[in-house]
Amino acid sequence: LFCLNAQVDLEYYLGDISNYNQSIPTPESIIGHQVGELHVSHDKLSHYVQEVSKYSDRVKLVNRGKTYENRVSWLMIITSESNQSRLEDIRKEHLELSNPKNKNIDISNMPIVVYKGYTVHGDEPSGTNASLLLMYHLLASDSQETKDLLENTVILLDPSMNPDGHQRFSQWANNNKNQSLNPDSNDREYNQYWPRARTNHYWFDLNRDYLPNQLIESNLKIQTYTEWLPNIMTDFHEMGTNSTYFFQPGVPQRKNPLISDLNQDLTKEIATYHA
């Protein structure tokens, strides 16, 4: 995401945007630069999600609480206008799917619920930056494909799962980047001082806190999960250019005995598809 010159525009990322709603503000119009020219900071991200939510009936913006450094953990609930008008009913109907006593629920017209979480590790920034493009596309595109998607989907968009870590990284990277981009991995921009920005305020790896659930950021995510019980959970990470991409199921011998074999079968199918 950050190997580009400053001349890129939205069409570089999104293709033809001629059918986009012009009343929906672009990321650049709010944060002051094109996505990818600089690392978006959490304060600029917060500004954009608040502003763009004012102009669309497709989104409900939720302030879930604040981190240890007093940054807001935002959740954008994005779906069609008609679904927004009955969002609580949709949520309650969806939760009934988890009730084993309800075996004959008609799901033919029930939207799927998808949670999309970005950058739980603060120095894996492409997720949060890409989320700006996704939220703009979902709120501005008037294509029939997008309308159909939103009519059949409730998207729980969590643009920054680690606000404090992401802020720490964006400040470091923007302070140390060159006007002429330097691809050398030894450049100061790519080598943060300890404790770096992977962690939250207390230097804890939030990707290890889903089960112990000790930290505010994890509490807020799990609260969203239990309120909705989404059909699909996505957790967008980033890996270095010299690394192979990790997919479950991983090494079979390391499987927790409490994890079902079905989980192994499903994740292997997903990994095989992407491979």
Task: Enumerate the predicted regions with their spans.
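The substrate-binding groove and active-site-proximal loops of carbohydrate-active enzymes
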Residues: 33-39, 120-125, 202-215, 222, ...
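A non-catalytic alpha/beta surface segment that caps or lines the substrate-entry region
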Residues: 42-82
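Divalent metal-coordination and catalytic microenvironments
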Residues: 41, 70, 119, 157, ...
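Bacterial Sec-dependent N-terminal signal peptides
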Residues: 1-9
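Acidic/histidine-rich, surface-exposed loop or edge segments in extracytoplasmic proteins
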Residues: 17-37, 116
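Loop/turn elements at helix/coil->beta-strand transitions in domains of secreted/extracellular proteins
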Residues: 56-59, 71-73, 110-113, 151-156, ...
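Surface-exposed loop and adjacent secondary-structure segments within mature catalytic domains
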Residues: 8-19, 74-80, 90-96, 101-104, ...
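Active-site-proximal loop/hinge segments that shape catalytic or ion-binding/gating pockets
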Residues: 214-274
